[in-house]
From Swiss-Prot:
Its main location: membrane. It is found in: Membrane. It comes from the Eukaryota. GO terms for biological process: mycotoxin biosynthetic process. A motif (HXXHC 1) lies at residues 151-155. This is UstYa family oxidase phomYd'. The chain crosses the membrane at residues 47-69. GO terms for molecular function: oxidoreductase activity. Pathway: Mycotoxin biosynthesis. PANTHER family: CYCLOCHLOROTINE BIOSYNTHESIS PROTEIN O (PTHR33365:SF4), YALI0B05434P (PTHR33365). The lineage of its organism: Eukaryota, Fungi, Dikarya, Ascomycota, Pezizomycotina. Belongs to the ustYa family.
Length: 234
């Protein structure tokens, strides 16, 4: 029986310090996998952040370019612009363009009794010297002429306003003609203008069309004005 149970007859494996149980190996492998997963997750987040930053940068650049183009178009469009000069205006003069707000004065006003008051076109005391003799008195050709002249001046003043407000700087050169041995203004030059047909259509519709502004209550129309409105036969 000793030969079966003798300790000397059995081989025992030595457990060296480097030998690790299977359960501990699985724990280390799990931890390693978790660490690798964490690293991959962090990497994906970093890639996502970088992509978002890159996309944001590209979007910001695109918006900046678009805004720059819009400003460029407004300033240097195909036809130019009012504050920076139109296409056919003199280049050297464009740099002196400055915008300002200006109120023109001198429009006639009418009192309830029909009296017409014509103030001076510029601020200051009224110049009444000689006005009574020019526009008031016995009917005469001279008196009628003075009133007509005043009406013409009023119309010319409106033309002056339009010229001053537009301030067209398109050069109008002179051209030499042998027949007269002199220079003469050559006005056949292109200008940047508003389409008058469109403006006229708007004015007509605004005056007597679907977009007409209603008259103030109590307004009494004269026959010429009624003809303009089309509510009085010729």
């Amino acid at each position: 029986m000793e030969k079966f149970f003798s300790p000397s007859r059995h081989n025992y494996a030595d457990l060296s310090p480097t030998d690790v149980p299977a359960s501990e190996e699985s724990d280390e492998a799990l931890e390693e996998k978790q660490f690798e997963y964490f690293q991959q997750r962090q990497h994906r987040r970093l890639v996502l952040v970088n992509r978002l930053l890159a996309a944001s940068t590209v979007a910001l650049v695109m918006v900046s370019l678009w805004l720059g183009w819009e400003l460029h178009t407004a300033k240097f469009g195909s036809m130019g612009s009012f504050p920076y000069g139109f296409k056919y205006e003199l280049e050297a003069a464009k740099k002196v363009i400055k915008l300002e707000e200006y109120k023109f004065l001198g429009s006639p006003i009418f009192l309830d009794d029909g009296t017409e008051l014509v103030p001076e076109p510029t601020p200051g005391p009224m110049k009444t010297l000689g006005v009574t003799d020019m526009y008031v008195g016995e009917p005469s050709k001279e008196l009628d002429w003075n009133w007509n002249q005043l009406h013409w001046d009023h119309c010319l003043n409106h033309l002056r306003q339009m010229i001053l407000c537009q301030g067209d700087l398109t050069p109008i050169p002179s051209k030499y003609y042998r027949g007269i041995t002199d220079n003469y203004i050559f006005g056949d030059m292109p200008h940047t203008c508003r389409n008058w047909d469109s403006v006229r259509e708007f004015i007509t519709d605004r005056f007597n069309g679907s977009s007409a502004v209603p008259l103030a209550p109590g307004t009494v129309l004269s026959d010429p004005y009624k003809k303009l409105l089309g509510i009085l036969d010729e």
